[in-house]
Amino acid sequence: MTIEQIDNWFTYHAPSSDDLVTYEKLRNSARDFAKAINDLCPESADKTAAIRKVREAVMTANASVACKGK
């Protein structure tokens, strides 16, 4: 890990118009998956964890877009 990587990860990256479209697609896909989990899985700690991990996945995917894969 380099200082440049750390600096990149902790720097605000203003989204481009293309990024905004990508973020929306990621959120919509994740929302659909989370709804499927909600509909198909019984109420449980595992269901809650599964939906939380979908949310975490979206945040991590958004970070990859913002940081341009760096």
Where in the sequence are the language-model features?
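Short, compact, well-ordered microdomains
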Residues: 46-69
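Intrinsically disordered, low-complexity regulatory regions
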Residues: 1-46, 66-70
